[in-house]
Amino acid sequence: MRGLILALGFLTRLPLPVLRDFQCAELVRAVVWFPAAGLVVGAAVALAAALGTVLDPWLGALAGVVMWAWITGGLHLDGLADTADALGAAHRDPARFLTVLADPHVGSFGVIVLVLQLAAKLVLLHWLLTLDLPWPALVLIPAWTRWAAAGWTLLLPPLKPGLGERFAWQGNRAGWGAGGLALAAVSAITPIAFVALIPAVLWGVWMWLKLGGQTGDILGAGIEWSESAALLLAGVSLALARGIIAG
C-alpha cells in the first residue's frame, strides 16, 4: 500500500497521508503502481467530463481538461513545455538540448506548445463526448500512458543524473510487465483503449533514435503527447466504426 500512496503522491495532487520516512528507492519500486495512479487520473477526468456533459458537451470537455491539469498538478505539462523549449532552441546540439531542458524558465516554444496541447485536449474530448466514447476508455487511456512511461524508464538509459536515472537502474521489470497484463485484461471490456499504446510506442522509439535516452521532462512530454494522440485515434476509430468517416 505504501507503493500506491507514493505513486499517487508523485503523479497526482490528491490529499494523501504523508510518508515522512520513505526512501527514494521506495519511489522507484512504486513504479509498478503508476498504471493504478493513471486509473485514478482517468476516473477523475471521466467523472468531471460526465458531470459537465449533463449541461453541454463543451462544458463537459472543459471540465475534463481542467480536472486533467489539476489532478496532475501540471507535472506532465511542465515537462512538455520544457521539452518544447529544448527542442526549439537546441538546433540539434545534444549538449544545448540538455542545458535548455534544465532551465526552469518557460520560453516561447513552451508557451505555444502548452496552449496547443490544452486546446487539442479540449477539442478532442468534446469530439469524443459527442461520439459517446465509452467512459471506461477515458479512464484507461491515462493508465496506459503512465504504464508506458514506466516502461520508457526501464528500457531507455537516462540522459542525465536524477530521478529518471534511479528509475532506469532500479525499476521492477517483472512488476511493470504484470501491470501491463492486468491493464490489458481490464481493457478487454473496451478495446478502443488499446489505441494509447500506438503513440506511446512511437514516443519511445523517437526518444531512442533521436535522443538516445530519457529524462523526467521528456517522460512527462511523452505522457501528454500520448494522451492527446490516443484521444485523436479513439475519435477516428469511433467515427470509422459508425460510418461518420468513410473508410
From Swiss-Prot:
The keyword Transmembrane helix applies. One of its GO terms (cellular component) is plasma membrane. It is found in: Cell inner membrane. GO terms for biological process: cobalamin biosynthetic process. GO terms for molecular function: adenosylcobinamide-GDP ribazoletransferase activity; cobalamin 5'-phosphate synthase activity. It is an enzyme of class 2 (transferase). The keyword Zinc does not apply. It catalyses: alpha-ribazole + adenosylcob(III)inamide-GDP = adenosylcob(III)alamin + GMP + H(+); alpha-ribazole 5'-phosphate + adenosylcob(III)inamide-GDP = adenosylcob(III)alamin 5'-phosphate + GMP + H(+). Its EC number is 2.7.8.26. It holds the Pfam family CobS. Pathway: Cofactor biosynthesis; adenosylcobalamin biosynthesis; adenosylcobalamin from cob(II)yrinate a,c-diamide: step 7/7. Its cofactor is Mg(2+). InterPro entries: CobS (IPR003805). The chain crosses the membrane at residues 31-51, 57-77, 109-129, 136-156, 189-209, 218-238. Keywords: Cell inner membrane, Cell membrane, Cobalamin biosynthesis, Magnesium, Membrane, Transferase, Transmembrane, Transmembrane helix. It is a multi-pass membrane protein. Its main location: membrane. NCBIfam families: cobS. Joins adenosylcobinamide-GDP and alpha-ribazole to generate adenosylcobalamin (Ado-cobalamin). Also synthesizes adenosylcobalamin 5'-phosphate from adenosylcobinamide-GDP and alpha-ribazole 5'-phosphate. Belongs to the CobS family. This is Adenosylcobinamide-GDP ribazoletransferase. It comes from Thiobacillus denitrificans (strain ATCC 25259 / T1). The gene is cobS.
